[in-house]
Amino acid sequence: MGSAGESPIRFGFVTPYFQGLDWARHCEVSGADLITCGEGPTVFDDPTLSLALYAEATTRVRLGPSVTAPGLPHPAVLANTYSTLQKLSGGRAYLGIGTGDLSLIQIGERPYRLDAFLEYALAVRGLCAGEEVTYGGKPLKLEWTAGPVPLWFGADAPRALGLAGQHADGVIVGQAFHPDIVEHVRQHVGAGAAAAGRSLDDDIEIWYVLRALVTDEEHGAIRIDGLDEYAARQTFFLWRMAGKPERSELAAELARRKGLTIDDDVAERLSGFTADYDEALAFNSKHNVHLLERYGLTDWAGRLFYKSGPLEQVVAQVGELVAAGATNFLVPFMVGDTTKGVDQTAELFTALRASRAAA
């Protein structure tokens, strides 16, 4: 039987587009703990408007972005926005913020370095809490506040995870598709927490983005139109997250930066794939999908980036992540009807909890 001291398994939904008030209510009824909106100023709906409407439609789920970027608004503007969401939602808001890798690149700006990111993020949190802060050498203070807004960092790399452990109330991990990565995340967040006299399990929530899909075929997600393109992008992004290493350093850098172990044969094929990858054809093109096939990486990528197959197999796959210490999952909608996606996800987590309790 499951241990009485185990953390509960929770789930929430990630959507880049406004899905409607009935959808938000349906998420809450399904048992979801969180609704979060992606931010990309040139490609997604504005998250703050969607979140404000979801706040009106719901009473229990927590609400926030996954994740906003520093510099898009001034710290006082962002603090005012999420203080307002905190008021509208009755205290259910959180603020997820990252260094802005994609959001800032999309508008021709450079992502923030970690030190500048930390200064920005902590200034926003202090302002939300009603404190006077110094930002850019100038004092700032909001004239009103709805109370503290929990600060979550979007983090994947070791140093960012360590800073999250030191400072953040929560962490959103965008790439946590393997038990080794979960252990890697917990190690670095835990080290940061310990250095600050904090507790990994008591003071910090870690939420992992989980791409799970029930399909007729085992590991069937990679065969679905659109998801194959996503897997190709993620394969390239994995290499980029490792620091764009040369072939001879790829396996070592993935292990160091991500906690992911690959063998020499996969490293060789990954190096070939990334050398031929065309970022200009990353969307609405099968060019990079065909590259995955050419380098024999299609099945490898499908197993790595997706938890898919018949329900009992997906439960077993996600159960491996739970056994490694992951208990909070954010599920993005990748294809198909989003209301049906809510129902399938709720069914998956009901089965996952039952499996854990019976173990």
Predicted segments with their positions:
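Hydrophobic faces of well-ordered beta-strands that scaffold small-molecule active sites
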Residues: 9-15, 35-37, 62-66, 93-97, ...
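Alpha-helix-loop-beta-strand connector modules within alpha/beta enzyme cores
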Residues: 46-68, 72, 120-127, 191-195, ...
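Short, acidic/polar
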Residues: 16-27, 78-81, 154-163, 310-320
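Glycine-rich, proline-tolerant flexible connector loops at the mouths of alpha/beta enzymes
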Residues: 34-58, 69, 101-103, 175-179, ...
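Active-site mouth loops of central-metabolism enzymes
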Residues: 8-18, 67-76, 145-156, 212-215, ...
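N-terminal beta1-alpha1-beta2 module of alpha/beta enzyme domains
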Residues: 1-66, 149, 359
